[in-house]
Amino acid sequence: CIAVVFALAGCVLESSAPLFSEEQGELALKPLGTRFVGEAMENGQWKSDGAIGIFTASGRHYVLSSEKDDKTTDLLFVPMGNARYVLQMQDDSRKGEPYVYLIADVADGHAMLSILDCDQLKKLGGLEESIAFDGSDCSVKGNPGLALFSSLAGQIAPAKMRLTPVK
């Protein structure tokens, strides 16, 4: 469903430890349902691979699974206001994978996902106090909280991925 994000791992903003706790999470997708298809913008059109992701609430976060395999991804939506969230994700946490960060806007029946691409962040400039850049990789320094993500949300490219509910 959103496995494309992890195909980009090493190219998106990440951290080795979580920046946000379970208590900060919100079940942002609850009004939309539990089954979603991931779509990516290609040549001005939304296109899907048809894979359905199942978002199961667990406390104040989601566990994303699919009918195709037993891999899971933990997703924590941390509210920033106005239906905008920092999305903290960890693919198959049993293996100690890094946490990856996106910006999610939940509106109009979709969750629009904006990738925090390292090359794009480097071009913005002035982020060296908060983000360590190493080639095409980047990681958060310390724990800047929501302030960093609120700032980035206003500067990054529009969403190129979205989650669409499946009935």
PLM feature spans:
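C-terminal motif of bacterial Sec signal peptides marking the signal peptidase cleavage site
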Residues: 7-10
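Calycin-type beta-barrel ligand-binding domains and close structural analogs
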Residues: 12-32, 39-50, 56-167
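Sec-dependent signal peptide recognition
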Residues: 1-5
